[in-house]
Amino acid sequence: AYACSFPPSEIPGSKECLAEALQKHQGFKKKSYALICAYLNYKEDAENYERAAEDFDSAVKCTGCKEGVDLHEGNPELIEEGFEKFLASLKIDRKALGSLCTLFQKLYAIPHN
């Protein structure tokens, strides 16, 4: 079981819920950025993406946000669609993905492939 490292949102029914969690909680930000990096390397390492998606799903449960994001893990045809919904829910610009991944790797000292 996943242990939540941050409290649930005070606005669980809002469309802004996940975006707010991204701003307020390091634990959620870490899982979100890990998912971005895993997505950018999806073709080389699909397993890593699946793991990151599962971790992110657990972190979403911790937020209490009703909106949620279906990442379609295990369904390669729908990965792109799920990731687009993730970006929209978290209000992340697609153009920023590379920089966010680099930032994540620096913040958490993750070796770059």
UniProtKB/Swiss-Prot annotation:
Q: Name one GO cellular component term.
A: extracellular region
**Keyword Hydrolase on this protein?**
no
Could you tell me where this protein is found in the cell?
A: Secreted
- Per UniProt, location of the Lysine tyrosylquinone (Lys-Tyr) cross-link in this chain: K30-Y108
| Record protein name field | Ranasmurfin
Alphabetical list of Gene3D superfamilies matching this protein: 1.20.120.1410
Q: Keyword set for this entry? A: Disulfide bond, LTQ, Metal-binding, Oxidation, Secreted, TPQ, Zinc
Miscellaneous notes for this chain? Answer: After isolation, the blue protein turns green on exposure to air and sunlight.
Q: How does it assemble?
A: Homodimer. The two chains, designated A and B, differ in their modifications, but not, it is thought, in their sequence.
Q: What does the entry's cofactor note say about binding and number?
A: Binds 1 zinc ion per dimer.
**Residues in cross-link S-cysteinyl 3-(oxidosulfanyl)alanine (Cys-Cys):** C17-C65
Q: Where is this cross-link: Lysine tyrosylquinone (Tyr-Lys)?
A: Y2-K31
In this chain, where does the modification Aminomalonic acid (Ser) occur? Answer: S9
Tell me the residue numbers annotated for binding Zn(2+): Y108, H112
Keyword Mitochondrion included in the entry's annotation: no
Q: Which cofactor does it need?
A: Zn(2+)
What InterPro entries does UniProt report for this protein, alphabetically?
A: MB_blue_pigment_sf
